[in-house]
Amino acid sequence: MTINVLFLAAEAEPFIKVGGLGDVAGALPQAIYRSSKTASSKNSVDIRLVLPYHFAIKQKGLKPKLLGDFYVKSVDGPEPCQVYYYDQGDIPVYLLDGDPIDEKSPVYSSDPIYDGYKFVFFSLAALGLADFLNWRVDILQGNDWHTATAIYALKTLDITSPHLSQTKALHTLHNLPYMGFGVQKALTDYGLPAVKTSILPEWARHAPLPLALLTADRIVAVSPHYAKEILTPEFGCSLENFLKTRQSVISGILNGLDTEEWNPETDPLIERNFSVSSLTLRRENKVKLQRDFDLLENDEIPLLTLISRMDPQKGIDIALKGLEYIEDLPWQAIILGTGNPIIEKMAQDLEKVYPNRVRSVIEFNNKLAHQLYAGADIFMMPSRYEPCGLSQMITMRYGCVPIARATGGLVDTIQHVSHQVNGGTGYLFTRPYPSVFALTLKRAIKHFQDKKKWKGIQHNGMSIDFSWEKSAQKYIKVYKDLVK
């Protein structure tokens, strides 16, 4: 039996990437297709990726094939949608275009009304794609608020298409706070019915994401722990009571890591390649960092790093303030990232306070990020919330030991170091306070002095399989359950 999956996303590598969704949508469909073709799989999956034909994609010069067009209904009359096809090998890719997808706009603009029209149009056009292709859709998979309207429309509009008559809706939840507010007028103008149920709070009835969470047959959060957290007041964004009514259809599947791009054995962006069996070579990467940043060249001093978007969610202030609590201990730190000007200034100010041990690099620098993963000893990830997280997987794969807040996917991926000789892959702290972070970091620095224990922690982290295949197999199981 072949399961047909229409996978909708606002972005996907290698076509367009703005954030983490681009990584997921670029890698997951490919992994699902590959996993479904293995001898152990009883179901083949025909998964097709659908993206808006953003201006940024057009600039890449890919030259997709124009297949034709069809019309999307709106209260002002039908709107044309052009369908382009790009042959990506195993996964067919469809790029949908139309007037609401303005050629001059970015993928995500600062105007929620404009983005609302663009993504509501795209979501409804994606439903029309089934008839255009004469292709039965077994699973419609949405991602975040941008494609949530497709889920809601499938379940609430009077859709007569035989290709959608048995379709099940699965919505993947990447980041609950981003619900798509400001989209109400677009929903009305495209004929989406108002929500009348009292289960969903009044304030949430006009945003696409809550509407998808209300109507989807299955909801998959991007980590098992995050699937539990969204049911609590701290992480539920005032939807926790509503989400508890949907608890039976909520589960969590951890995102994967592109293990070809992030491979210390072959990474062309680092000074010295290494593996678990040649871990001593890793030191050359640390030496390069210390020399490049004019830090004391001493392998006995732990080199800390933090690579992140400068955003309050990431808890960077927790780490920066926490370092001041342990100024009497030996450490060096390199901070890399850009974003919120207040947090950027905090990083720069810390360098002024500790000019011999702190370096702040306020920019996006992919090459430096690779080198930091490969050369630093300890990775700081004090996120206030982290639905899945990617950096902790990379850092462990590169032999850099993470210290992270015990939240979301960080709980699912980091095994807290115990008092045993070789237990764990990193360190977790519970409360998001600088003092608590500092105590955990102090413990890690103490363990760093014990070379046998530290090497064991590195080995544990580097030995974990974070590939997308594990995630893909779990999604295929969800597909099977839905089409039974």
Protein language model annotation of sequence segments:
Residues 1-484:
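Catalytic cores of nucleotide-sugar-dependent glycosyltransferases that transfer UDP/GDP/TDP-activated
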